Amino acid sequence: MFHIIDSERDLKILDKELMLSNHLAVDTEFNRKGKEEIELCLIQVNNSEETFLIDCILLGEYKNNCKFLFSKDVKKIFHSFREDVEAIYSWTQSKLENVFDSQVANSFL
C-alpha cells in the first residue's frame, strides 16, 4: 500500500510521523535539464510499514516540511544516492544528514 502526499497539510503530518523512525528507505525521481539543472519530481519513502510518495511538483516551493530528511536521528538509506542528494538539494537548498548508500556499502563486500 502507498500514500500519495500532495498537500502541505499531509506533508506536515507525514513529517512528524517519519521523525519518529529510526531508519527510512528513500529514493527520488527527477528531471535533469541539461548538465547543471535538476528538478525534483517525487520522493519515495518507506518506513518498513508503509510507502509514501511525496509529489514535489504539486507541492511546489519547499516550505521546510521534510525535516526527517535532515535529522541526524533518522538514518536515510539510499541506493546510489549521488543524484538523489543533488535532486533533494535542488528543492530544499539543504544538505542531508545521516545517510547510508547501499551501493557504496556493497563495494566493501
Name each region found by the language model.
Residues 1-109:
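Conserved RNase H-like, two-metal-ion catalytic cores of nucleic-acid enzymes
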